Amino acid sequence: MSGHSKWATTKHKKAAIDAKRGKLFAKLIKNIEVAARTGGGDPEGNPTLYDAIQKAKKSSVPNDNIERARKRGAGEEAGGADWQTIMYEGYGPNGVAVLIECLTDNRNRAAGEVRVAMTRNGGNMADPGSVAYLFHRKGIVTLEKNGLSEDDVLMAVLDAGAEEVNDLGESFEIISEPGDLVAVRSALQSAGIDYESAESGFQPSVSVAVDAEGARKVFKLIDALEDSDDVQNVYTNVDVSDEVLAQLDTD
C-alpha cells in the first residue's frame, strides 16, 4: 500500500513543483554542492554526485549552473556555503508521521520555518527519535514505465540487490538497501532502461490510511514545508488508497 501513498504524494508534488521551479532548482543545486564537498568533485568516483547531477539534468537545470555548483562544492571555485543536514520529526493531521530533512546554512532559521509550517497546518513537532524509528533509509530508484512490465524491471535489477519493485501507476519504484543503490542503477543502465532518479530516502515501515479530507490536509502540510528553502525532503507514512486518489483528482 505504501506505493499508492508514494504515487499520490509524488503526483501531488509534481503539480506544486511546476509552480516552484526556482525553488526546485535551488534545492537540486544544493544537493550537487554538498555531494561534491563530501565525496569529491569527480562524478565518476562519487556516485552520490553522479546521481545528484543526473537528477538536476532530468529536471532541466542548466548545465552551467550544475557545473558551477560542482566546482563550488569541490573547492575549485569560491562561494560555497557551509551546508548542514538536520532532521526534524513531527506528526501531521490524522497522526501521520512526518520526517523533515533540511539542508541549511542557518540552523535557527530552519528550525523556525519548520515549526511555523507544522503548527499552521495541523502538525506538531516531536522529540528526536520519536518518529524516526517508523522509517528506514533505503535506496530508491524511480523510472517511467515506457511500456515496461514489472517483470522486465525485476529481471534487470534482481541480482543487483533490489528488494522490491512497486507499481506507482505511471512509474515504477525500486527499493534496495542504500549500499546497493549504485548497483541497481547500473543494472538498469546495462539493460538499456532509462530511470528518473536514484537516491537514498526514507521508507515508512508502518503506514496510516487517510480519507480524502485527511489527504488534503497532509498534502497542504507537505506543501508548506517544501516551501521553505531550507527543507530538502519531506517523508511521511500517509497511505492514500486508489479510491481516495480518485476523489482528489476531481478537486
Curated annotation (Swiss-Prot):
GO molecular function, a single term: DNA binding
Where does it localize?
Answer: Cytoplasm
Could you tell me the keywords of this UniProt record? Cytoplasm, DNA-binding, Transcription, Transcription regulation
Annotated Gene Ontology cellular component terms: cytosol
Q: Which domain of life is it from?
A: Bacteria
GO BP, one example?
Answer: regulation of DNA-templated transcription
Q: What's this protein's family per the entry?
A: Belongs to the TACO1 family.
Q: Kindly provide the name given to this protein in its UniProt entry.
A: Probable transcriptional regulatory protein NFA_37020
